[in-house]
Amino acid sequence: MARMHSRDRGKSGSTRPPRVAPPSWVEYSPEEVESLVVDLAKQGYEPAMIGIKLRDEYGIPDVKLITGKKITEILEEHGLAPELPEDLLNLIRRAKRVREHLKRHPKDLHSKRGLQLIESKIHRLVKYYKRKGVLPEDWKYDPEALHVE
């Protein structure tokens, strides 16, 4: 399938092997993994970065296989879940960066078009998250009012 806003077909990549049980070489118990996730979240890491750190530094390939819960589910249980979903937050940050670029370079039409595409993705995601009940129905994307770091 093609990419959303271009005709590119993407690139091939390896797929993760389907596993039912955690690998035998993982030496962490579910409780230890859960506490690691909570500790990393308290240090300020986002869910995707927590997964990468656990994979690269602790040798934990898949949190869900070991604990039976996703990283965001663990964070929700401990009251550490981000208020906005991570993919939406990343798109909002990207739009903010492009908007700041356009303040300095107002004639950059390619970036203006890029901002339109990013904001289209934001609106599409907001609609999805409202439908799923993740965001409240009255939540609205307002680039000036939203303050994300």
Swiss-Prot record:
<dbReference type="Pfam" id="PF08069">
    <property type="entry name" value="Ribosomal_S13_N"/>
</dbReference>
<comment type="similarity">
    <text>Belongs to the universal ribosomal protein uS15 family.</text>
</comment>
<feature type="compositionally biased region" description="Basic and acidic residues">
    <location>
        <begin position="1"/>
        <end position="11"/>
    </location>
</feature>
<dbReference type="InterPro" id="IPR000589">
    <property type="entry name" value="Ribosomal_uS15"/>
</dbReference>
<dbReference type="InterPro" id="IPR023029">
    <property type="entry name" value="Ribosomal_uS15_arc_euk"/>
</dbReference>
<dbReference type="Pfam" id="PF00312">
    <property type="entry name" value="Ribosomal_S15"/>
</dbReference>
<dbReference type="GO" id="GO:0003735">
    <property type="term" value="F:structural constituent of ribosome"/>
</dbReference>
<dbReference type="GO" id="GO:0070181">
    <property type="term" value="F:small ribosomal subunit rRNA binding"/>
</dbReference>
<dbReference type="GO" id="GO:0022627">
    <property type="term" value="C:cytosolic small ribosomal subunit"/>
</dbReference>
<dbReference type="InterPro" id="IPR009068">
    <property type="entry name" value="uS15_NS1_RNA-bd_sf"/>
</dbReference>
<dbReference type="GO" id="GO:0006412">
    <property type="term" value="P:translation"/>
</dbReference>
<keyword id="KW-0687">Ribonucleoprotein</keyword>
<feature type="region of interest" description="Disordered">
    <location>
        <begin position="1"/>
        <end position="25"/>
    </location>
</feature>
<keyword id="KW-0689">Ribosomal protein</keyword>
<comment type="subunit">
    <text>Part of the 30S ribosomal subunit.</text>
</comment>
<dbReference type="InterPro" id="IPR012606">
    <property type="entry name" value="Ribosomal_uS15_N"/>
</dbReference>
<protein>
    <recommendedName>
        <fullName>Small ribosomal subunit protein uS15</fullName>
    </recommendedName>
</protein>
